[in-house]
Structure formats: structure tokens, C-alpha cells
């Protein structure tokens, strides 16, 4: 049994968001611009910066024990790994990305079958080949080094498979989405032998739990206040909460303390109602984790 867990931090667009998420979960990761080996304030962790496109193969080989990458790249490499959990976050939003089949706006193509014999361009070559092969649709799939949208506009290919969140860039280039091929979110993946190691599995599960709790706390705040005891029922009815607000009696008083967790955006509309119902000493505080 090893007392060191080798963790792959995704280099690139997810890098800063991942480091911030670890900080909220309780780990401080320090990354130097001249090093691929980040420092971390945990003697049991050894972090490495790895491109998400390659994370799956290194986890599968056991070069690293666990890492975070988009599910799209795990599927692209057909990696034989354990998917520990989803980690729905990105540098922009918390929505999944979509890999979509795209053609020119004036194309006659309405479904994947209409592309039989066509040439497609994409970064996701392996997945795209398997997708069409499974449906017995003969196509040629070429790797794209970038500017993929321009290739179908310039007639360099018949269609593309491209990643998008909203589809706005695709529409702006006078292109049309035929259908979605895959939805992807960041996932934590583990090497199968590492997952079977009791110490490593417990460490991985601890990290996953705390990272997910930090994600759950995003946009949430705690609200605490005092109120007359006879107003407690009315106040708790207007307070949203995961289960029910916490109500406790103040020492030697007929007043109570009320505490609840709610979405930060709800505070501005709820506080005036709380004041009208007799609440006093209202305190709003940030949350790092919800477990």
C-alpha cells in the first residue's frame, strides 16, 4: 500500500477552475508557470498537470491514480477507468458541453444517415468514427487542428463534429446543428488497481466528497436571525431550506434564533419579508461546503 496518491489536474481551460474548487474544498494548490508539478498542502497528494485529452490514458496505465477530465476525452480514448463522480463545472458555467454534428445552413443534410460517403472534420476522431460505424454509416473522419467551423464553410469537408455550450458561435458562422452526438461534463476518473487499494480508494472518495460539497455550496449562503417566539412559525414558512430551518430558543428569553441555507439570489426578496415579520439581527454568511 502506498501513502501517496498521484492526482492529475487538468491543464488548460479547466485548470484555474479546478484549483479554485480544491481551495474551497480545503486544499491549496500552487502552480508555477515553469513547472508541470504543482505544490499542494497535503503530504499524501502528488499533483501533476496533464492535458484533459490525455488524462484517460495515463489513469488507465496507472501513471497517475486519479484525475479530472471531460467525459468526452475519456470516451474519445476509450479509456478503461473507474468513473468516480461527475464534477459539473467549467471556466464559464456549470452547464454540460455538447458535441454536435454541424453542416452549412443551406445543406440538404437532415440526419446522420444523409452523410453516407461524406468527409467529416473534428478533434474527436475516435468517438466520431465509432459513432458512425455503430450505425453502419460509411464516412471519412479527418482530424482538425482548429478553426473547425471554417472548414465546412470553405467546403473543405461536408460536416464537422464540434463542441458547444449554447450553439451561438455555430449560428454566427451560418452553420446548422443536425443533432447532438454526446453531452459531456468533467468527471473524476480512477485507475482500476488504485480503486481496489483500500487506502487510495478512501482518499479518492474523501476528495470527491469534499469537491462535490464545494460545488453544492456555490451560490448558496447561510442566513441567521433572531425573532420573537410567536413569530417563528410565520418566519420559517417564508424561509427556503434544504430540509427545514433550524430554530433554537435564546437563553432566558422568549425569543428564538432561526438559521437557514438558501440561494444567494433569494436573499434580496426574502429579507424585507423577514423584517416585516419581526426578525432582527439578520446575518448573511458565505458557505464553502454543503455536505
Swiss-Prot record:
Main location: cytoplasm
Superkingdom field: Bacteria
Catalytic activity: 1-(5-phospho-beta-D-ribosyl)-ATP + diphosphate = 5-phospho-alpha-D-ribose 1-diphosphate + ATP
Single annotated GO MF: ATP binding
The keyword Membrane appears for this protein: no
Keywords: Amino-acid biosynthesis, ATP-binding, Cytoplasm, Glycosyltransferase, Histidine biosynthesis, Magnesium, Metal-binding, Nucleotide-binding, Transferase
S-S bridge residues: none
Required cofactor(s): Mg(2+)
EC number annotated for this UniProt entry: 2.4.2.17
Subcellular location: Cytoplasm
Segments forming a coiled coil: none
Family annotation (Pfam families): HisG, HisG_C
One GO cellular component term: cytoplasm
Biological or metabolic pathway of the protein: Amino-acid biosynthesis; L-histidine biosynthesis; L-histidine from 5-phospho-alpha-D-ribose 1-diphosphate: step 1/9
InterPro entries for this protein: ATP-PRT_HisG_long (IPR020621), ATP_PRibTrfase_cat (IPR013820), ATP_PRibTrfase_HisG (IPR001348), HisG_C (IPR013115), N-reg_PII-like_a/b (IPR011322), N-reg_PII/ATP_PRibTrfase_C (IPR015867)
HAMAP family in the cross-refs: HisG_Long
NCBIfam families in the cross-refs: hisG, HisG_C-term
Family assignment from sequence similarity: Belongs to the ATP phosphoribosyltransferase family. Long subfamily.
Name the record gives this protein: ATP phosphoribosyltransferase
Organism: Geotalea daltonii (strain DSM 22248 / JCM 15807 / FRC-32)
Amino acid at each position: 500500500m502506498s501513502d501517496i496518491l498521484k492526482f492529475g489536474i487538468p491543464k488548460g481551460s479547466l485548470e484555474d477552475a479546478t484549483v479554485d474548487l480544491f481551495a474551497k474544498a480545503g486544499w491549496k494548490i500552487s502552480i508555477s508557470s515553469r513547472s508541470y508539478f504543482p505544490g499542494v498542502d497535503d503530504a499524501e497528494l502528488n499533483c501533476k498537470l496533464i492535458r484533459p485529452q490525455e488524462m484517460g490514458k495515463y489513469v488507465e496505465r496507472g501513471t497517475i491514480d486519479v484525475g479530472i477530465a471531460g467525459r468526452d476525452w475519456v470516451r474519445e480514448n476509450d479509456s478503461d477507468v473507474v468513473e468516480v463522480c461527475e464534477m459539473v463545472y467549467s471556466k464559464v458555467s456549470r452547464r454540460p458541453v455538447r458535441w454536435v454534428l454541424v453542416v452549412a445552413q443551406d445543406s440538404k443534410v437532415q440526419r446522420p444517415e444523409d452523410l453516407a460517403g461524406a468527409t467529416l472534420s473534428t478533434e474527436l476522431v475516435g468517438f466520431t468514427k465509432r459513432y458512425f460505424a455503430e450505425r453502419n454509416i460509411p464516412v471519412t473522419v479527418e482530424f482538425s487542428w482548429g478553426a473547425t467551423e471554417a472548414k465546412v464553410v470553405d467546403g473543405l469537408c461536408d460536416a464537422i463534429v464540434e463542441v458547444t455550450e449554447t450553439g451561438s458561435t455555430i449560428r454566427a458562422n451560418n452553420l446548422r446543428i443536425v443533432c447532438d452526438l454526446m453531452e459531456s461534463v468533467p468527471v473524476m476518473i480512477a485507475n482500476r488497481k488504485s480503486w481496489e487499494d483500500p487506502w487510495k480508494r478512501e482518499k479518492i472518495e474523501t476528495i470527491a466528497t469534499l469537491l462535490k460539497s464545494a460545488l453544492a455550496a456555490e451560490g448558496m449562503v447561510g442566513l441567521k436571525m433572531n425573532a420573537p417566539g410567536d413569530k417563528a412559525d410565520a418566519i420559517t414558512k417564508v424561509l427556503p431550506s434544504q430540509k427545514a430551518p433550524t430554530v433554537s430558543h435564546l437563553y432566558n428569553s422568549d425569543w428564538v434564533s432561526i438559521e437557514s441555507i438558501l440561494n444567494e439570489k433569494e436573499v434580496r426578496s426574502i429579507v424585507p419579508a423577514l423584517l416585516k415579520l419581526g426578525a432582527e439581527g439578520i446575518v448573511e454568511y458565505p458557505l464553502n461546503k454543503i455536505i
